[in-house]
C-alpha cells in the first residue's frame, strides 16, 4: 500500500524574485510550460496554445468578475479598519473580512472610504455580517479598490483594475481573479473560434480562501473553503457536443475545474446536469476526474490546495518535475505570472 501523501509532498522552494508583481506587457505575452500526455515538458509561448488545441475541443472559462472588494476606514472609536468583502448575500448586505486592532461587535458602525457607514450585524466564523446604506456593488464600484493577492506588494492602481480582470468577465462576485484567463485577449479568442475550438462558461466566485494555506499535515483533516458556483445548461450541452465529436474538455483555470467537477459530483452516477450552489470540493491525488481532460493554469503556491488539484490531474511526480523546471528556467509565478498547459497522462 502506498504511503499517504502529506503536506510536505506539495512543498517546493521558490525564489521570491520569481513572484510576478505585474502582468506581462500584453495579455498574450507570457510563457507557457506544456506538460504533454507523455509527461514531457516543452517551453513555449502563450500564443502556441492555439497549435495545441484541436477542432471540437471545448474551452471552459470562468466568467466571474472581480469586484472592488477592498475598503478602508475607521471605527467609531477612531481606530483604523480594513474591510474585504468576501460574499454579497443581499443587495445591501455582505460577509466581510475585517482587519482591525480589535474586532468590532454587533451594532458597531464602520465609517468607510470617508463616504458612508456600514453596520456590523453579527459574525459568522471568521467573517462579519455588514449592512450597507445602499447596494453593495454600487458602493464598491464608487469607493472600493481592487483586492490584489497578498504576495503582490504594491497598492492596486488603474493598470490592476484593467489587467486583474479577464476580457470576458460578466458576473460580479469574485475577490480574486481566475488568473489562467488573464492571458486571453480578444484576437486570441477569435483565432481559436476560427480554427474550430469551442467555448463555454461556468461561474465560480473566487473567494479570499483561495490564498489560505493548508495548515495540517494530514490532508484528510483540511477543511476546504466554500465558493459559490453555477454550471448552466448551455455548458452541459456544449460538453455533450464536444464529447460526441471527440473533443476534449479543457478547463481554463482551477476554478473552472472546481465548478465542473462539483457539478459532476452533484450528479453522482447520473449524467452531468446544470448545477449551482456552494462547493467545498477538495481535489487531491487519487481523485478521479469525471469531466476535465486538460487544464490551462498558472503556477500555484507551495503547499496549496490548487497545487494538489493539478497534481491530481497530472501526477505528483510530473508536477514536481515541472515546477523544478519552471524555477530553473525562471518562469514567472502566481497570479500575474506565466501559464502551464497540462494534458491528461496517457493510460
Curated annotation (Swiss-Prot):
Keyword Cytoplasm carried by entry: yes
Listed EC numbers: 2.4.99.17
Chemical reaction(s) catalysed: 7-aminomethyl-7-carbaguanosine(34) in tRNA + S-adenosyl-L-methionine = epoxyqueuosine(34) in tRNA + adenine + L-methionine + 2 H(+)
Pfam families in alphabetical order: Queuosine_synth
Biological processes per GO annotation: queuosine biosynthetic process; tRNA wobble guanine modification
Bridged cysteine pairs (disulfide): none
Gene Ontology MF terms: S-adenosylmethionine:tRNA ribosyltransferase-isomerase activity
Keyword Membrane recorded: no
Catalytic class of the enzyme: transferase
NCBIfam families: PRK00147.1, queA
Family as reported in the entry's similarity comment: Belongs to the QueA family.
Functional note: Transfers and isomerizes the ribose moiety from AdoMet to the 7-aminomethyl group of 7-deazaguanine (preQ1-tRNA) to give epoxyqueuosine (oQ-tRNA).
Subunit structure: Monomer.
Name of the protein this chain belongs to: S-adenosylmethionine:tRNA ribosyltransferase-isomerase
Native species: Bordetella bronchiseptica (strain ATCC BAA-588 / NCTC 13252 / RB50)
Gene this protein is translated from: queA
